[in-house]
Amino acid sequence: MDPLHVLNKEERWVKVPIRIHKEPIVVKVQATGTTDNPTFLVELDEVDPAIHELIKREICRIFRWDISLHAIHEHFQKTNLKQIFEEHYGTPIVLDFHPYNSLVKCIIHQQLNLKFAFTLTQRFVTTYGIEKNGVWFYPLPETVAKLTVEELRALQFSTRKAEYIIDLSKEIQKGNLHIDSLYEKSDEEIMAELIRYRGIGQWTIQNVLLFGLGRNNLFPLADIGIQNAIKKLLQLEQKPTKEEMEAMLPEWHPYLSYASLYLWRSIE
């Protein structure tokens, strides 16, 4: 579990750090219903009532309350993923709290074991982000753009990763990359735009599309975890080839992102 998340599993709540017009706001979201009849209680900081609708929209986006998990579950009952969808019934895709956070986190996590990746991300956020009511907010791009490679190296970043994150943040600050405009673009347009930046490859973009922007039909074929999950589920002697996985995708379409999530869950 991400150590930056502030939550209570027993009481079923999580505190969500969001920014409206760059202002940090902590929103407490508590599950009060059931898997089949989900309801939620949302508690806000004292904020201007004029932005309540913006906050509501952002929380709905993060938790994907517009998506019917029942319809997705029914879709996979007719596929070879039926077993894992029954075992993990009702598991939603919950998004990273902002696409910029998602991009930075994915760059940090590249080629690291999960434990150290979380540690490094936590160091970065708690050193350069801000804390409010016990909840940490990622630093804004303009803050990161002012950092030096040496400052991130002191946190145990590699030189290249430090350069990638600082350079990306500078491009956002200059207005060359508009993060919020990604919501309106197709997967292909986003791939073509982000691939131009150093340190951002196909794996990173696919993860940002899935967990940063909430696209429903993403399946990272090169992901080792997914390959191992398919091998385990289908009792294969070796990991499936790219061609073998591609042959499975039409059956799972148009919910490939949920196939990805449930395959990951099956090997946790």
Report residues per predicted region.
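HhH-family (HhH-GPD) DNA N-glycosylase catalytic core used in base-excision repair
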Residues: 1-268
